[in-house]
């Protein structure tokens, strides 16, 4: 279902207008603050958005590097170019990633990804795609679109090559999403079908206009939309209620090539904090969680980690363990002496 960009009343139009230029965004925000209006409302239910620059990235990519002041780190074959960050070039056996150094503690958020996938390969002779991550671990290379398998968190995959030979009902490129608590492996042979939350076809390769992906997480409701037709409108792709994601994870994006390849470029990543009104009942229901999960979807080993013991608790455990050990030894000695005394009486 398309969300047409009409007047500035719709939240989609507002976001697109603000995303055009960071300078105009800041100027507009300052004018709004100066007039006492604050950030613009972007939807029903009193929802407002704020750009979080510590979790965002755009040209000229000054926050990318290895220094202590850098907000983003590159990994593998990823390179900073003038107009984009190239995760992988159109060459075989390459992988690269871009990771935010700052953990995200936002409760409700929206990530807008401006990307481009292109290359020389003809139909079905290109790959493999890219992924957008919100995970507990960062900078961990692996086989899942350049990231580690059995990750903890959320992965959104733009898969450009079908590995499953017998699949016919699915047209690639294909966008899918997966929530993992560290117990599941991504099934490459079946293109991730056993663990996906949903997906949609997305013809995003070798296009001559901008392509965008939006990941929205509000009130434990995950929504993924795309703007890939050059019409400046969002199309729904995935919508999943009951998604529980812990706070304090990292945003990143990665890509990998094998025998087939493509250029996988990221132009910008922009994260918005969404302020959403909650009822008292929703406040109770939406408490922080320790492990990612999805309601009505059973994941193996869904056991929350025990909180670490405090110093006092550890001392008391050791102390009482020693007392119990000494007590057991004393009782053992007393019983042994009584047994020996009874044995001597029988002997005489």
From Swiss-Prot:
Ranges facing Cytoplasmic side: 337-348
Organism: Homo sapiens (Human)
InterPro entries attached to this UniProt entry: ConA-like_dom_sf, Intracellular_Lectin-GPT, Lectin_leg
Disulfide bond sites: 200-237
GO molecular function: D-mannose binding; metal ion binding
Coiled-coil portions: none
Protein name (record): VIP36-like protein
Effect of residue 53 to Q: In MRT52; no effect on general protein glycosylation
Transmembrane regions: 314-336
């Amino acid at each position: 279902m398309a969300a047409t960009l009409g007047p500035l009343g719709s939240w989609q139009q507002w976001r697109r207008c603000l995303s055009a230029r960071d300078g105009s965004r800041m100027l507009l925000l300052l004018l709004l603050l100066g007039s006492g209006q604050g950030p613009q409302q972007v939807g029903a239910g009193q929802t407002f958005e704020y750009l979080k620059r510590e979790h965002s990235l755009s040209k000229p990519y000054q926050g990318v590097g290895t220094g202590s002041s850098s907000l983003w780190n590159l990994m593998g074959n990823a390179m900073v170019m003038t107009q984009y960050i190239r995760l992988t070039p159109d060459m075989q056996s390459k992988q690269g990633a871009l990771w935010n150094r700052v953990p995200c503690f936002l409760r409700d958020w929206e990530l807008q990804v401006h990307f481009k996938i292109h290359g020389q390969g003809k139909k079905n002779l290109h790959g493999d795609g890219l992924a957008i991550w919100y995970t507990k671990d960062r900078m961990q290379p692996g086989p899942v679109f350049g990231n580690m398998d059995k990750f903890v968190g959320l992965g959104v995959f733009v898969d450009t090559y079908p590995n499953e030979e017998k699949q016919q009902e699915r047209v690639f490129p294909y966008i899918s999403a997966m929530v993992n608590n560290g117990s599941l492996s991504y099934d490459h042979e079946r293109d991730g079908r056993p663990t996906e939350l949903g997906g949609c076809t997305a013809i995003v390769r070798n296009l001559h206009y901008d392509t965008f992906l939006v990941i929205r997480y509000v009130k434990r409701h995950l929504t993924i939309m795309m703007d890939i037709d050059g019409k400046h409108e969002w199309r729904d792709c995935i919508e999943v209620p009951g998604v529980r994601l812990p706070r304090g994870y990292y945003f990143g994006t990665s890509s990998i090539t094998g025998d087939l390849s493509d250029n996988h470029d990221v132009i910008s990543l922009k994260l918005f904090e969404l302020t959403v009104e909650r009822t008292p009942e929703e406040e109770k229901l939406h408490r922080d969680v320790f492990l990612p999960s999805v309601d009505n979807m059973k994941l193996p080993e869904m056991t929350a980690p025990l909180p670490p013991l405090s110093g006092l608790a550890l001392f008391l455990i050791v102390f009482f363990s020693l007392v119990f050990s000494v007590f057991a030894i004393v009782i053992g000695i007393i019983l042994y002496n009584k047994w020996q005394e009874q044995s001597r009486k029988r002997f005489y």
